[in-house]
């Protein structure tokens, strides 16, 4: 139920395709699971954190991912090296702050 209260969804995707997985399919399956739980979750803003970008194969997989999901916001990170984590944190703070501000304005207008 916590997910229903989230202003923004962060979806972590293994871009290295570990264990012969396809990051595009993993993302598609995650969206399908969200839809099964509650279709309105698909309307929430989201960011994909493209993890394992320190791995050589991740760049090619990321390019394929971006071709399929052109409108999805993707930030590159590596949990192993820490690359991109600060940028991701700043982006999350910026977006959640903006979304929460809009929610407050909307609630005031409804009263």
Model-derived features with residue positions:
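Oxyanion-binding "anion nests"
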Residues: 13
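C-terminal-of-GTPase-core extension/linker across diverse P-loop GTPases
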Residues: 18-111
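An anion/phosphate-binding loop that grips the pyrophosphate of nucleotide cofactors and donors
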Residues: 6
